[in-house]
Swiss-Prot record:
Keyword rRNA-binding in record: yes
Protein name: Large ribosomal subunit protein bL9
Known role: Binds to the 23S rRNA.
Gene: rplI
Alphabetical keyword list: Ribonucleoprotein, Ribosomal protein, RNA-binding, rRNA-binding
Recorded coiled-coil stretches: none
Length: 151
């Protein structure tokens, strides 16, 4: 299916590009998320008329993400979990826990789908580096300090 991208999509293209994707990817993800439209003649004409407006919105989103990344880079988030004597956690720290901790710390815009944990879930006490993907071009590094509570 031919689609017009309404914003930058990772591994696919930039705003305004006409790309070919699988039908299911377009119908089930890109179009419902308002990241793309079908590439019909009418849609292309309408897009060209609204191009400047869409580019302005994209620039505002990018600027907001960069401002948040400046505040978030190097931020240390402390999370307490019940742990055993050997330092292993009862359970684990997930991206949802990190996102909730960031929300409580005042970073309301960070959602769990934006938190990337390179080594998977955290299962031991210690200091870990986690990434927050705020925009296709903006990534912030957050230090997560996992402290153990005696059970």
């Amino acid at each position: 299916m031919q689609i017009i991208l309404l914003e930058k999509v990772a591994n696919l293209g930039n705003l305004g590009e006409v790309v070919r994707v699988r039908d299911g990817y377009a119908r089930n993800f890109l179009i419902p998320q308002k990241k793309a439209r079908r590439a019909t003649d009418a849609a292309l004409k309408e897009f060209e008329a609204r191009r400047a407006e869409l580019e302005k919105v994209q620039a505002e989103k990018l600027a907001a993400a960069q401002a948040l990344a400046e505040r978030l880079n190097g931020f240390q988030l402390k999370i307490s979990q019940k742990a055993g004597v050997d330092g292993r956690l009862f359970g684990s720290v997930t991206n949802a826990d990190v996102a909730e901790g960031l929300r409580k710390a005042g970073f309301e815009a960070v959602e769990k789908s934006q938190v990337r944990m390179p080594n998977g879930q955290i299962k031991a006490v210690g200091e870990y580096l986690v990434q927050a993907v705020l925009h296709a071009d903006v990534v912030a590094d957050v230090v997560v300090l996992v402290e153990g509570e005696m059970a």
